[in-house]
């Protein structure tokens, strides 16, 4: 899709740090936005900002942990902005902790929000896009989904699922007028795990240097404009390491260990546990850090 002006888009996770930057990038291209998230106040703040810039933006409140709200999201978004040309699946949650510390309910919530909900929303958006002969679905995954990450096992697993989902959907759509792309950022400055890390006073090794959220937002535009299969957004070239991981897994493990990444994530999980509030909804346990919600 070369010209996005006048295109209608649904952006999930719009209220989060990265979501706000994606919204601004799309709005700057003239895209009409349905901004989705769980909480009205930050979404309304973003809508006011975008409207002051001359953009068209409406709100669609939805909790992606609720199957009913997820299934109804496309219909509600199209009622606000019209038939959708673009879907950007950006919402997600993460929590740094030892895998054995998670409860079954916590795993189920993370799987539903991070993996099942994007698949369901895309399934509801796809028929209309195909019928109209125009559309693109962008899903924000993570480098964790490409390489695995200690002390964030559940998150990395759901993000790996998004990579597989997008690749499979793209293969099915080959030759169709609808594209599918997956964006895999590393640490994103001022957002998510990186932001919490800074709050906790934990310093990441240089190998995990963060990228600016504006760069990730530009990757979303690039994926749509050029129908990219996938884009890795990292401070360092990652494809060589991923190739080594496939060809020589043990060597890749030694390389990652040498960066200090494993020790860093262990420390982050420990600090998150120590600073956990007494009641962290939506997690049912009171002794764990709540997930970082990017809806």
PLM feature spans:
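Residue(s) in the substrate-gating loop at a strand-loop-helix junction
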Residues: 142
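Conserved glycine-rich cofactor-binding loop
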Residues: 8, 13-16, 39
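Conserved glycine-rich Rossmann-like NAD(P)H-binding loop of the short-chain dehydrogenase/reductase
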Residues: 31-45
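Substrate-binding pocket helix/loop in short-chain dehydrogenase/reductase
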Residues: 98-108
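Active-site helix of classical SDR
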Residues: 122, 158
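The beta1-alpha1 cofactor-binding region of Rossmann-like NAD(H)/NADP(H)-dependent oxidoreductases
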Residues: 61-72, 104
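SDR active-site lid
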Residues: 171-236
